């Protein structure tokens, strides 16, 4: 009876080794590449109309630190980093914008460029389809 005990331990050792090799948590043979998400924004030609008193009728009134063409180098770099693809590069893009209310439209409401924008992305970091306006 005791002569078979080493054989039983040998089988148990081999079975345990096979079980450990089959368990997850080891080093995988292949890695999965990260998933890339692309956001495509299509903006029609600017149709924003400005009513008397500096209010937008088709977008939101914003105060932007910079307003540049979507084809400019800084804007294309920022759009690329954020994964935004524009179908039309002939639109104006507002950078680092904050919304303006009717109360904030007065003289000291915006010390940069006041614009009316159709699309706001990333909480005002990028506003797409902007039209500069002058508030009197």
Swiss-Prot record:
Self-assembles to form functional amyloid fibrils called rodlets. Self-assembly into fibrillar rodlets occurs spontaneously at hydrophobic:hydrophilic interfaces and the rodlets further associate laterally to form amphipathic monolayers. Schizophyllan stabilizes small hydrophobin multimers in aqueous solutionand is necessary for subsequent hydrophobin assembly into films on hydrophilic surfaces. The gene is SC3. The keyword Disulfide bond applies. Belongs to the fungal hydrophobin family. Induction: Expression is regulated by the mating-type genes in the secondary mycelium, and especially repressed by the MATB-controlled pathway. One of its GO terms (molecular function) is structural constituent of cell wall. The protein contains 20 mannose residues. It is found in: Secreted; Secreted, Cell wall. Its main location: secreted. This is Class I hydrophobin SC3. It comes from the Eukaryota.
